[in-house]
């Protein structure tokens, strides 16, 4: 009941929310669709979105390709370490948002802090990790063959979400500034992330002080 009627179709809690502070360039990666992930990983795939909370001057991220390439070229560029030459390099600013459907190659760049809302899944296929090694001293695993299977090798599509920041089957994301009234109706819970400032949250007859970095689960029907 706490999740709401719209969540009855999901077999597990539908989303995860995170704060990501990239002190270095993160790996270039892709997430599979539900169909592919269920068949090959026995898990769901992943669609996600980023909301940029802060960034260093001249920060950028990778978001899909800047032009369409073939599967053969994709594989070759992974092997010869020239993949970034054909990726869509996007300068970022505080307040920017990016919707990342499954199959979209992506990577957060150094000096960027984002709030991430994602489908509840851990399936990630890395294609490039800058030669870094893990705690065991060995290069971190890459998943090139599976990435070749699932990656859309075209520029990212443009999306119109109307008044929402992002919207898909798994989540709807809105940005609220200043005071606002109830959002958690009987259809769905609300995951509330405090991204700036401080204030008060009044829910179910209780008042809670909130500040930047806090997160709250508001049960369905709590107003």
Describe the residue ranges of each PLM region.
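Short, charged beta-turn/beta-strand-edge "cap" motif at the junction between a beta-strand
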Residues: 104-107, 222-223
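Extended, charged low-complexity segments
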Residues: 216, 221-222
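Active-site region of the double-stranded beta-helix
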Residues: 1-94, 109-192, 196-198, 202-204, ...
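Noncatalytic modules at the cell exterior or secretory-pathway interfaces
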Residues: 95-99, 223
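N-terminal intrinsically disordered, low-complexity, charge/repeat-rich segments that act as generic
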Residues: 31, 100-101
């Amino acid at each position: 009941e706490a999740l709401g009627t719209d969540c009855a179709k999901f077999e597990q809690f539908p989303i995860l929310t995170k704060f990501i502070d990239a002190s270095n360039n993160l790996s270039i990666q892709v997430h599979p669709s539900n169909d592919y992930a269920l068949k090959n990983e026995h898990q769901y795939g992943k669609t996600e979105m980023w909301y940029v909370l802060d960034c260093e001057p001249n920060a950028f991220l990778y978001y899909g390709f800047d032009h369409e390439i073939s599967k053969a070229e994709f594989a070759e560029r992974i092997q010869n370490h020239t993949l970034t030459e054909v990726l869509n390099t996007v300068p970022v600013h505080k307040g920017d948002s990016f919707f990342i459907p499954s199959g979209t190659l992506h990577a957060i760049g150094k000096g960027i802090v984002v709030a991430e809302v994602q489908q509840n899944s851990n399936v990630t296929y890395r294609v490039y990790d800058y030669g870094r090694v893990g705690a065991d001293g060995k290069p971190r695993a890459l998943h090139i063959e599976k990435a070749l299977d699932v990656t859309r090798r075209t520029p990212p599509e443009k999306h119109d979400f109307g008044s929402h920041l992002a919207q898909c089957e798994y989540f709807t994301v809105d940005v609220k500034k200043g005071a606002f009234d109830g959002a958690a109706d009987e259809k769905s819970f609300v995951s509330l992330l405090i991204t700036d400032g401080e204030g008060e949250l009044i829910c179910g007859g209780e008042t809670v002080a909130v500040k930047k970095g806090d997160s709250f689960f508001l049960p369905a029907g709590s107003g």
